[in-house]
């Protein structure tokens, strides 16, 4: 369903409603014979032309140009974009909720937040805020906590 929405609208919406675009339904080339970026509509048009051409006059790489071959890449790209962007939305919301409650992260790396902790009560409070930052999720979020004297030694 995500692929059809992305293909039809050239965009998808993240968990927080943020718009992620798919410019002109472009796909990266996955063979040596293709240019770095190809517009799907042009690929489909070229495929129709190839099928109308007698087989002996078709280019050597004509089977590589089948648009169905690239549908898997488009599905992967649209799902990956949705998952990664929604995870970023969730991390931003968790950061905001933590800051609103007086817990300021010192460092963020992708989906990890590093806090300076003074007592165990802060750990439980931060963990609960992060796990419940988007309560409408059907699958609950789980937060792994690592403690240490430095970020590298946290376990």
State where each predicted segment sits.
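Conserved catalytic core of nucleotide polymerization and phosphodiester-bond processing enzymes
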Residues: 1-155
